[in-house]
C-alpha cells in the first residue's frame, strides 16, 4: 500500500476509491474495501482509500476526545494488511470542512486524486454539514465524470442482546468496549482489541503481595480504554507473547484514589520490563473491579483470577495482532 500525503510530489494513477475515517478498520469497513478492490480489478484501475490522519471533529473542536479504536499508525497498519493500492491521507482543515459535496468531489477526488469511480458506504455522507446524500453524489458525479456506486450493506452474523445480525459500526464497538465486552468487540473488529504503550513505574503494591505488575502508559491519549475490570490478555514484547492477567481501574481495596491505572501481571514471568514497549491484546473480561474487605481477601481472589485467566488463554489462540510490536 502506498501512503500518499502530498500529491504535488506523487501523482496517483486513476482509481476506484471510497471515503471514510475507518476507525478500527472493522468488519463493515473490510467489506466495503473488498468491494472497492473488486471493482478496481474489474475496471483495470487502482484501489484507493481517502481518509484522515486526525478525527475531523477533533480538528473542529480541540477539546473533543474521539476515543479511538485505532491510532493513526495502527489504522494504517491494518489497512495495509487488507491490500489496497493507495491510502490517500487528507488533512481535514477548516477549509476542507467548508467544501460542499460537489466541491469536495471536484477539487479533491477528481482533480487531486484522479478518482474515476467512487464507492459510497450504505450510510456514509460527506460535504459541508453532511447535508447531502447519495442521489446528490450521483448527480454531481455525472457532471464531473465520476461514476458513483452505492456499496452493498454489510450483514453481520453477530447477535447482541438477543438481536441478530447487528449492524457493525465503530460506535457499536466503542459501546461494547465501554461495557467490557471485549470478545464481542473482537467479533465486530475481526481481530482482538489491543492497547500499545510503555511500561512505567507503579506503586509496587502488587510485588509485595505476590502479583507483580507492569503498569502501562498508553501511547495515544485518545485511544479508548475498555471498562474497568479484570481481563485475560496476551502480553507481547521483544517479539514474544505471554499470558497476562490485566486490571483496569482505581484499585479500590488499596485506596488508589481517583487515579485509573492499567496494570498487568504476566503469568510465570518474573523479570523487570520497565521502559519496554508492550502490546496488550484483550481476550475476555473475567470480572468487574471489586473492593475487598482486606488485602488477604484480595490475594485469595487474585489466585482464583490467575487460574481462570490461564484457563481462558490456554483455550484461546493468540491473535496475530498480539504479535505485532514496534
PLM features per residue range, with description:
Residues 145-247, 326:
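Glycine-rich, Lys/Arg-enriched anion-binding loops that position phosphate/diphosphate groups
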Residues 9-13, 94-97, 154-161:
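A short acidic, often aromatic-flanked loop/helix-cap motif at beta-alpha or helix-coil junctions
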Residues 26, 79, 118, 185, ...:
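Residue-level signal for inorganic ion chemistry
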Residues 2-8, 88:
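Short acidic-hydrophobic, aromatic-tinged amphipathic segments that line or gate anion-handling sites
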Amino acid at each position: 500500500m502506498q501512503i500518499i500525503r502530498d500529491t504535488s510530489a506523487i501523482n496517483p494513477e486513476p482509481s476506484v476509491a471510497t471515503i471514510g475515517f475507518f476507525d478500527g478498520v472493522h468488519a463493515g469497513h473490510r467489506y466495503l474495501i473488498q468491494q472497492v478492490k473488486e471493482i478496481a480489478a474489474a475496471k483495470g484501475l487502482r484501489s484507493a482509500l481517502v481518509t484522515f490522519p486526525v478525527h475531523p471533529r477533533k480538528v473542529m473542536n480541540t477539546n473533543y476526545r474521539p476515543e479511538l479504536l485505532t491510532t493513526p499508525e495502527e489504522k494504517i497498519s491494518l489497512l495495509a494488511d487488507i491490500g489496497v493500492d493507495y491510502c490517500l491521507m487528507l488533512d481535514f482543515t477548516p477549509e476542507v470542512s467548508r467544501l460542499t459535496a460537489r466541491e469536495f468531489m471536484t477539487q479533491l477526488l477528481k482533480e487531486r486524486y484522479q478518482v474515476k469511480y467512487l464507492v459510497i458506504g450504505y450510510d456514509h455522507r460527506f460535504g459541508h454539514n453532511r447535508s447531502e446524500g447519495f442521489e446528490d453524489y450521483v448527480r454531481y458525479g455525472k457532471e464531473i465524470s465520476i461514476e458513483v456506486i452505492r456499496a452493498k450493506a454489510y450483514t453481520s452474523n453477530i447477535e447482541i442482546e438477543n438481536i441478530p445480525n447487528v449492524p457493525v459500526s465503530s460506535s457499536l464497538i466503542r459501546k461494547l468496549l465501554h461495557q467490557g465486552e471485549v470478545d464481542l468487540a473482537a467479533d465486530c473488529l475481526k481481530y482482538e482489541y489491543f492497547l500499545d504503550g510503555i511500561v512505567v513505574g507503579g506503586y509496587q503494591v502488587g510485588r509485595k503481595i505476590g502479583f507483580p505488575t507492569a503498569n502501562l502508559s498508553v501511547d495515544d491519549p485518545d485511544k479508548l480504554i475498555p471498562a474497568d475490570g479484570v481481563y485475560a490478555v496476551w502480553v507481547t514484547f521483544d517479539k514474544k507473547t505471554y499470558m497476562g492477567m490485566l486490571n483496569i481501574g482505581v484499585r479500590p481495596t488499596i485506596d488508589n484514589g481517583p487515579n485509573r491505572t492499567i496494570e498487568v501481571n504476566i503469568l510465570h514471568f518474573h523479570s523487570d520490563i520497565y521502559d519496554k514497549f508492550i502490546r496488550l491484546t484483550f481476550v475476555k473480561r473475567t470480572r468487574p473491579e471489586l473492593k475487598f474487605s482486606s488485602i488477604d481477601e484480595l490475594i485469595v481472589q487474585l489466585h482464583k483470577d490467575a487460574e481462570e485467566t490461564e484457563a481462558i488463554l490456554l483455550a484461546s489462540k493468540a491473535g496475530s495482532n498480539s504479535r505485532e510490536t514496534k
